């Protein structure tokens, strides 16, 4: 760190002038735009879809639901996370959480895809979701995965409290906060024969390649992940999110990139 001397970021000028090319900026001929449809319940099953209104809009390419989605050979995502619970998108009718991807609308323009996605309706068999942490913490199961110790104990807390002259017992809460980078999450997937190129805003492109290869049963040598710029990450671009495998899945279900 220098004092009174400017420090130039390697990518700073490109980002502040708009010259930086992010993942969603890469254009491919005949590209289709995908927008997910999200669940409105926290737990249960999907009974049925009503796609009629969405299908009436001009520019529709395809609507992917669990009934017509590409069957994935693997539900694991990464070898180091083999013991973690896996949720394979669009592979069954189960709903595990509110906001889960339950369908994908593809259209010739982004605006059309967004509008069509808003018209897709789903009916559910809703189950009771366990959302109260305090009442269920006693039955929590320690995670087995991740390669790190999940439970720590250090020192004698109760002993320290008993010896303290003053003890403050209070509950503090903070509002929900979200990292909001200049580059939103988006992925462009381009199939050329059996080779895949992903334009991906990622802080860990090797992880993305390994996950996609594992999930889809593709040799890693056939996958190229490109992320020349990352428009802010804050850790949110250090993992694999749903839009990436959905973009990879989509071209296998239709003939457009």
Give short role names for the model-derived ranges:
Residues 233-254:
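Thiamine diphosphate
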Residues 157-216:
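Conserved beta-alpha junction segments in alpha/beta enzyme cores
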Residues 154-155, 194-196, 202, 230-238:
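Helix-loop-helix module between adjacent transmembrane segments
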Residues 73-78, 116-119, 201, 209-211, ...:
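Short acidic, glycine/serine/threonine-rich loops at helix termini
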Residues 65-66, 222-228, 255-257:
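Beta-strand segments within the central parallel beta-sheet cores of soluble alpha/beta enzyme folds
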Residues 33, 96-97, 190-197, 230-231, ...:
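Short, surface-exposed connector motifs at secondary-structure boundaries
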Residues 53, 209-225:
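Phosphate/pyrophosphate-binding loops at sites that engage ATP/ADP/AMP, CoA/4′-phosphopantetheine
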Residues 1-146, 167, 243, 253:
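Flexible, low-hydrophobicity surface segments
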């Amino acid at each position: 760190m220098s004092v009174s001397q400017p420090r130039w970021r390697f990518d700073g000028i490109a980002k502040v002038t708009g010259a930086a090319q992010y993942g969603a900026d890469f254009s491919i001929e005949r590209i289709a735009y995908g927008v997910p449809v999200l669940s409105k319940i926290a737990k249960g099953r999907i009974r049925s879809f009503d796609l009629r209104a969405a299908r009436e809009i001009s520019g529709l390419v395809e609507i992917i639901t669990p009934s017509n989605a590409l069957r994935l050979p693997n539900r694991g995502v990464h070898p180091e996370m083999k013991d973690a619970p896996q949720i394979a998108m669009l592979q069954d009718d189960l709903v595990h959480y509110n906001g889960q991807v339950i369908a994908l609308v593809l259209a010739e323009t982004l605006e059309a895809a967004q509008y069509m996605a808003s018209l897709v309706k789903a009916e559910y068999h809703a189950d009771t979701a366990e959302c109260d942490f305090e009442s269920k913490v006693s039955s929590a199961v320690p995670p087995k995965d991740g390669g790190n110790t999940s439970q720590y104990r250090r020192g004698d807390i109760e002993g320290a409290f008993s010896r303290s002259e003053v003890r403050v017992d209070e509950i503090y809460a903070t509002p929900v906060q979200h990292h909001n980078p200049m580059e939103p999450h988006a992925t462009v997937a381009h199939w050329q024969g059996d080779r895949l190129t992903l334009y991906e805003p990622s802080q860990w492109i090797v992880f993305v390649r390994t996950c996609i290869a594992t999930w889809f049963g593709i040799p890693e040598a056939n996958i190229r992940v490109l992320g020349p710029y990352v428009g802010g990450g804050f850790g949110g671009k250090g993992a694999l999110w749903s839009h990436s495998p959905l973009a990879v899945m989509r071209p296998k279900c239709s003939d457009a990139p």
